[in-house]
């Protein structure tokens, strides 16, 4: 965002959320997670940063400026893991390593608004990983494949 880079750095026992100035290699600030957490996707919503954990079935909400932990939230029961996270201007959109994208209430991310299953003309894609929302589409990479999907979030087709 602007000249600031936010990074969700995952590794059990070493996970953290970091903030960098563009072009710099040292973080200006960071917040470490508990040792049992493997952090995954993150996204910015207003003055907050939302972050998922891989298998802990919870996410974190931070103050964007200080990266101070504001709160935690449990995943909706249908989400198995936390992989990627983005924001479409209304809802958080999360992936869990399956073919599904979960639309979560930004004011209460433990509540699922809806979910979609992603498919192309001839193939169903699973292991949806990192997510980005841009110009009305969700972009998702497929884990360990050189594929980036362009997904219509209203009619979950691939372009």
Where are these regions (language model features)?
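Beta-rich, blade/repeat-based domains predominating
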Residues: 1-2, 35-46, 76-92, 122-136
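A short beta-strand motif characteristic of beta-propeller blades
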Residues: 25-33, 68-75, 111-123
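Glycine/small-residue-rich loop that forms an oxyanion/phosphate-binding "nest" at active or ligand-binding sites
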Residues: 32-78
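Histidine/lysine/aspartate-rich catalytic loop segments that bind and position anionic ligands
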Residues: 94-129
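Beta-propeller domains
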Residues: 5-32
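Structural signal for beta-propeller blades
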Residues: 14-17, 58-59, 100-102, 146-148
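Short loop/turn segments that connect beta-strands within beta-propeller blades
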Residues: 20-25, 63-67, 106-109, 152-156
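Conserved beta-strand positions in repeat-built beta-propeller and related beta-rich domains
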Residues: 1-12, 49-56, 92-98, 140-144
